[in-house]
Amino acid sequence: MSDTNPPEFMRFVPPDAQQLARAIATHSERHAQVLRGGDALALVDASADLAGLLTQAGQQAHALAVLAPHQAPADALSAHEPAAWFWCAYATALQYLGRRDEAEPVFAKAVAVARAGAWRRIEAMALHHWGRSLVEQDRVHEARDRFNQALALREALGEPSQASSRRALAALAAL
């Protein structure tokens, strides 16, 4: 992999672009309503949801613009699960903007917030996404560790997404 512009490792590609566009429109409207309402927790949640969809659509710069103004509330609300989703979305947007060094501590924050709240589903997702970012930096050993942690959590939860972690580990073995 190139150090200057590493390829994306197993990036999720939504199967239905039109459905994704509709979801973005719906969540954009929800985000605007929540922004006007002033509920900080609802805003952190709505920002994370919208940013995740934007990143899926390849609009990670827009995702980061949605998230950036709400970092302080996300920090203040770290005792609530949406904060963990917020930091995972933020780190993933940074990752796909090629700002992986900046994403690293944000992935760590997402995992720490999820662990503190015992929110295993988002912990597994953040670990899995972090693993992909590490592969993109040729840090395969660390990536394998994150994928194994994600897989263990997903297996314990009976999550269908455990198949994604298994595929990532198999792809790593082929590198």
List each language-model region with its residue ranges.
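Residue register of alpha-helical TPR repeats
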Residues: 45, 85, 125, 145, ...
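Short coil/turn linkers that connect adjacent helices within long alpha-helical scaffolds
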Residues: 36-39, 75-79, 113-119, 155-160
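Structural signature of alpha-solenoid helical repeat junctions
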Residues: 42, 82, 102, 120-122, ...
